[in-house]
């Protein structure tokens, strides 16, 4: 072995536990969550990338006899690979990496049920959901309420807890999906796995978030169930690194007083999670392994060949410059302000009338603008959803309720002419002005937004009472590209606006 190869091998080995080569008295569960179609290393951090992830997974498998690989949802949506190819790339990647178990995230539903079935039926992993009743859907035959894997002479039972779709997933894109109480479902199936399937260990894969306030989350799941050894979570993009000085809490007592480990890797494949079950004392530990450039010399040529025909068009779109910025934008408030102002200005063109204000959601922004050139790829990746601009005619009373809904979530994006003082704990706005004037509950306002919010999703139920008076036929990112290439943003250098328009 050359010195260079030896050095590379040592770098990989540093990611492994010291006793890994000698130990066979443990089970290693590798896990990911919320990778969001980030196939290449993420442009903002340089971390992640499926080539590196596979190198790390292969290294663990080569050094550990008892390994399982699982994912906790939101494999898709967030890059050009999904926008252009609709899940085909992610399907091939998950199979190439050899995932054993996968669950649904909310973004798996983004393209609707028929495309979802096409994506799911091509996966090799076991597909499970414990608290979605899918009997009225077109994917019911693809899922089981749990799965059992035998490894290291032990039986490992997996169950899956999914997020409440109400107000989060467009109902038109999730037909036939019924939500069941997550705590009741988890307790029932955990009991079944322990007592009927005779599992030695039970792992819950979840896509409900680590700490969600008044909603079901991983902390609640840990504390109000029994029989579950670990929860491998997703949805909230939480990094739980027990070695960090400011680490999120990772160990909780369940109903029986037993310890439950809660794990999550953050987002975008920046880390690979590792949950280890010690077969000598039945203890469970967790950690995260950063997916960095140290792995670049260990890429799998077969995976590279799988990706090659998809990477070429993605790289081409990423090379088309459409605009410029004076400096990099942060997500909140700068990207949020820019999106809100764009939607308001462009909607005036669409509706051919004065627009009173705009409302957008931070969840609709998946990336940020860099300093310098903005490319077509930047726009499509930052605003990847199939949203359309709409203009609502809505009463001042219902508009005020919508702004209260925004306050309940800590503030979303509003146009530059809006100022609000929020009481987040009280879930209301104490004071709101539009163009310096308070909202008149009896007046009709014309509000620019996106169809997803106009449908009452993402907590914006009051907007359902408005009437759509104008709707763009284009996706939002196409309207943006048109504005950059031949509209009001042509040859305009963007400057970030850091004004906090809704204050606490």
Where are the language model's segments positioned?
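Active-site metal-binding motif and surrounding structural segment of the metallo-beta-lactamase
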Residues: 23, 52-72, 100, 197
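Hard-cation-handling environments
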Residues: 284-374
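Feature captures C-terminal
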Residues: 25-28, 38-41, 45-48, 52, ...
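Sec/Tat-exported extracytoplasmic proteins
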Residues: 36-39, 43, 57-64, 106, ...
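Conserved acidic residues
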Residues: 66-67, 100, 200, 229, ...
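Active-site-adjacent helix-turn-beta-strand microarchitecture at beta-sheet edges
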Residues: 24-26, 31-41, 68, 76-180, ...
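Short catalytic helix/loop segments, enriched in acidic residues and glycine
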Residues: 45-58, 91, 179-186
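Gram-negative bacterial Sec-dependent N-terminal signal peptides
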Residues: 2-21
């Amino acid at each position: 072995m050359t010195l260079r190869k030896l050095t590379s091998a040592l770098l990989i080995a540093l990611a492994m536990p010291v006793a890994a080569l000698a130990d066979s008295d443990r089970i290693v569960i590798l896990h990911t969550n919320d990778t969001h179609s980030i196939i290449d290393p993420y442009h903002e951090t340089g971390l992640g990338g499926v080539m590196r992830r596979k190198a790390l997974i292969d290294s663990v498998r080569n050094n550990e006899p008892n390994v399982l690989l699982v994912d906790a949802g939101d494999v898709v949506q967030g890059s050009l690979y999904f926008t252009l190819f609709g899940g085909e790339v992610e399907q091939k990647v998950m199979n190439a990496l050899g995932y054993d178990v996968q669950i649904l995230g909310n973004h798996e539903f983004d393209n609707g049920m028929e495309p979802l079935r096409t994506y799911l039926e091509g996966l090799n992993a076991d597909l499970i959901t414990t608290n979605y009743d899918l009997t009225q859907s077109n994917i019911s035959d693809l899922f089981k309420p749990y799965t059992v894997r035998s490894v290291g002479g032990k039986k490992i039972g997996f169950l899956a807890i999914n997020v409440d779709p109400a107000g989060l997933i467009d109902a038109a894109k999730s037909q036939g999906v019924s939500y069941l109480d997550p705590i009741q479902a988890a307790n029932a199936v955990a009991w079944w796995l322990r007592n009927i399937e005779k599992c030695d260990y039970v792992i819950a894969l979840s896509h409900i978030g680590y700490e969600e306030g008044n909603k079901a989350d991983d902390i609640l799941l840990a504390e109000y169930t029994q029989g579950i050894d670990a929860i491998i979570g997703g949805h909230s993009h939480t990094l739980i690194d027990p070695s960090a000085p400011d680490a999120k809490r990772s160990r909780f007592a369940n109903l029986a007083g037993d310890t439950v480990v809660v794990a999550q890797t953050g987002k975008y494949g920046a880390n690979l999670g590792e949950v280890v079950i010690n077969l000598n004392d039945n203890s469970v530990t967790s950690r995260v392994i950063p997916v960095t450039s140290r792995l670049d010399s260990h890429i799998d040529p077969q995976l590279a060949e799988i990706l090659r025909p998809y990477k070429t068009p993605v790289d081409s779109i990423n090379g088309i410059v459409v605009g410029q910025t004076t400096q990099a934008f942060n997500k909140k408030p700068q990207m949020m302000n820019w999106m809100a102002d764009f939607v308001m200005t462009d909607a005036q063109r669409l509706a051919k009338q004065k627009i009173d204000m705009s409302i957008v959601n931070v969840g609709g922004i998946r990336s940020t603008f860099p300093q310098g050139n903005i490319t077509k790829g930047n726009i499509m990746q930052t605003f990847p959803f199939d949203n359309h601009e709409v203009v609502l005619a809505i009463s001042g009373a219902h508009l005020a309720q919508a702004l209260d809904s925004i306050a309940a979530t800590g503030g979303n994006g509003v146009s530059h002419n809006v100022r609000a003082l929020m009481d987040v704990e009280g879930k209301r706005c104490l004071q709101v002005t539009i163009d310096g004037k308070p909202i008149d509950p009896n007046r009709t306002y014309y509000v620019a937004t996106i169809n997803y919010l106009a449908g009452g999703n993402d907590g914006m139920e009051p907007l359902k009472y408005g009437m759509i008076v104008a709707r763009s036929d284009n996706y939002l990112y196409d309207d943006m590209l048109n504005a950059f290439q031949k509209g009001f943003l042509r040859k305009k250098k963007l400057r970030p606006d850091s004004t906090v328009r809704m204050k606490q």
